[in-house]
Amino acid sequence: MTKQVLVELGERSYPIVIGQKLLSNGEPLARYLKNKNILIVTNETIAPLYLEKVQAMLSDFSCVTPVILPDGEQYKTLSQMDSIFTSLLQQNLGRDTVLIALGGGVIGDMTGFAAASYQRGIDFIQIPTTLLSQVDSSVGGKTAVNHPLGKNMIGAFYQPKYVLIDTDCLSTLPKREFAAGMAEVIKYGIMWDAEFFSWLEDNVEALKALDTHALEYAIGRCCEIKADVVEKDETEQAVRALLNLGHTFGHAIEAEMGYGVWLHGEAVSAGTVLAAITSNKLGLVEESIVCRITALFAAFDLPTSAPETMNFEQFIKHMRRDKKVLKGQLRLVLPEGLGRAGIYSNVTDEQLQEVIDCA
């Protein structure tokens, strides 16, 4: 069964289509690709698995070219993105071109940013192949590359025209990558939907076994929540910032440890537990809630504490560069219970040090 979620943004609205065997049927994409040149951006890991299948799906289109990039967060850079621009320019491709992002979050972010930048904007389509990209990064129009001094510091808000989520892609996903994606799934339950959080607690084994119905429900619910939030606040001026639960701590871990050493979802897992502990210290949540949050991450073999090699000074150095910082003041997304979160700027360095030291 195929599920569709619509991201309603007026003239820039687009569908998210979720189901099995979607890479075998190009018909749903046809109207978005009519009379267009197509450049498929993928990486060295995904290309042998799915590039041929996508090219076959697009066999009715005359100009379909791939660009194959190295795989890994450490390659999410302006210099690597230049390979996309070079391919476009060498083929004299203009604004009648569609970029297709075939891969995980890194490929999606880079392709989207390239689409936003090339000739001041061309269309792009997301075909996410990892759980993390299916439930989070492919939806909502955040595109970016990293800088040595911070994650996702160079980018743009730029919405795709279409998101195609084939859940069969998860069958080739390494277990560590699947677990990292579950960190973002769990995040939605904590910050938006307590009932979904409880459902996740009850369905750990089904999800780990890649049960089709469980996966499609979880991915669909995450996309519904993400669409709802993006419709309310596309450019993260208010409620969309809640989607960054765990990310201020998490981005600090990624930057300090070196991009790719910790997967993004692993850093978000540890970061969300740190945020929950901070909430408990501030009296926002009971310790029992912190225990449930920690236990659910642990059930998917995700880290629930900071790296032993990181100290408070290293954390705070990176956290001060967070995009939510306002007038020099750190703003943290903290859980207020299950299904609720808020933004707090009253957390002192002393309180943060206590949280980090005890984690």
UniProtKB/Swiss-Prot annotation:
It comes from Shewanella piezotolerans (strain WP3 / JCM 13877). Its EC number is 4.2.3.4. The lineage of its organism: Bacteria, Pseudomonadati, Pseudomonadota, Gammaproteobacteria, Alteromonadales. Pathway: Metabolic intermediate biosynthesis; chorismate biosynthesis; chorismate from D-erythrose 4-phosphate and phosphoenolpyruvate: step 2/7. PANTHER family: 3-DEHYDROQUINATE SYNTHASE, 3-DEHYDROQUINATE SYNTHASE, CHLOROPLASTIC. GO terms for molecular function: 3-dehydroquinate synthase activity; metal ion binding; nucleotide binding. Coiled coil: none annotated. NAD(+) binds at residues 71-76, 105-109, 129-130, 142, 151, 169-172. This is 3-dehydroquinate synthase. Belongs to the sugar phosphate cyclases superfamily. Dehydroquinate synthase family. Keywords: Amino-acid biosynthesis, Aromatic amino acid biosynthesis, Cobalt, Cytoplasm, Lyase, Metal-binding, NAD, Nucleotide-binding, Zinc. It catalyses: 7-phospho-2-dehydro-3-deoxy-D-arabino-heptonate = 3-dehydroquinate + phosphate. GO terms for cellular component: cytoplasm. The keyword Transport does not apply.
